[in-house]
Amino acid sequence: MREYKKLTEENIDEVVHKYVDYYNNHDNGCWTCEKAYKRIHQVMTIEDAECFVQYDGGEMCGFVMGYYKEFDDLKAYFLEEIVIFSEYQNKGYGATLMEELEAVVRRNGVEHLELISVNDAHHMHFTRNRDFLRQGIW
């Protein structure tokens, strides 16, 4: 059964280690735990951050992090990052994590969700299936 828990100081170390493993072993990254901790901690401590971790049967599958943005006429959410760890990809975990995120931010009054994505087939397939509109391309 999938469950969602807030990203906190109690679970950040596990998120950091899985993040480093994922990006360094599957995406040719050069992350250190120190750099990953700084990146994740920066986002999760932003005022109005909304970050949580997805679990299935007690196993961490992925996480999402971002923050609310207030405007004069609407409230938005900026999705800083969504990560589904490699062994859980292409099994619906990303879709259910996005569904949970969308439900949470809608309950909090969000009318607009925005993100920046890598322009590759894998990411474009995911965002297209979620009905995101493609805006600017560099």
Label the predicted regions.
Residues 1-17:
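A short beta-loop-alpha structural element at the N-terminal edge
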Residues 9, 20-41:
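Conserved GNAT-fold acetyl-CoA-binding loop/helix
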Residues 41-53:
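A short helix-loop-beta-strand connector motif used in the catalytic cores of GNAT acetyltransferases and
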Residues 53, 59-68, 76-78, 83:
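Conserved beta-strand in the GNAT
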Residues 69-79, 89, 111, 135:
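A conserved beta-turn-beta hairpin within the catalytic core of GNAT-like acetyltransferases
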